[in-house]
Amino acid sequence: MNHFAKRIIPCLDVKDGRVVKGVNFVGLVDAGDPVEIAKRYNDEGADELCFLDITASHLGRDTIVDVVKKVASKLFIPLTVGGGIRTIDDISRLLNAGCDKVSLNSSAIKDPNLIDEAAKKFGSQCVVVAIDAKKIENGYSVFINGGRIDTKKDAFSWAKEVESRGAGEILLTSMDNDGVKQGFSLELTKIFSALSIPTIASGGAGKMEHFKDAFEVGADACLAASIFHFGEIEIKKLKEYLKANGVEVRL
């Protein structure tokens, strides 16, 4: 699907209220402070921000709500939070704390009705479903639990089901490309561009050209982590490059 301006979304891993795999910006007082980092991305021209809560314990659920409250008060761009969201109550607490969207992953596979319920109660615009796809012999399969469990579901069929249940957006990660910095999976992104809801491409960004390539095959947004966090690519420069190459972005 092709919508309006293309979006650039940095993603931060948060554990026990701290950003892990620290962010290496010049002049950060505290490389683990989600509020400081969020504010920096806001100022750098990110279109949205994504937090992945990797806190394992249930106690940690309260921590992410506190983080969201603090960050949302300083942030002027949409914030999505994913990781460990299992119930309507979890979603409600995060949205009330000030996040704009929630990202469902394993929980959507285990209980697909959660998508319908969340979309009905909060609106499709709040519901993102994350799909981690890995190439298999004859297509792509959906994996959960950090890529450890093969659900044996076809990724595109699942995406169509998710769309029909009311999800407003799909966060598509190519497990084969993730962390390799050789580019997003263009084949996978192109397949998903046939959906009528937006697709965020994730996994594999290494240089500016990779973003351009993903947008050209139909991604609506691109998400990346380390290349932004370690200053390998500055968002402002990336957007200028994209604009110069005919990709519509908000400068």
UniProtKB/Swiss-Prot annotation:
Its EC number is 4.3.2.10. InterPro entries: Aldolase_TIM, His_biosynth, HisF, IGPS_HisA/HisF, RibuloseP-bd_barrel. SUPFAM superfamilies: Ribulose-phoshate binding barrel (SSF51366). GO terms for cellular component: cytoplasm. One of its GO terms (molecular function) is imidazoleglycerol-phosphate synthase activity. The keyword Amino-acid biosynthesis applies. Pathway: Amino-acid biosynthesis; L-histidine biosynthesis; L-histidine from 5-phospho-alpha-D-ribose 1-diphosphate: step 5/9. It is found in: Cytoplasm. Heterodimer of HisH and HisF. This is Imidazole glycerol phosphate synthase subunit HisF. The gene is hisF.
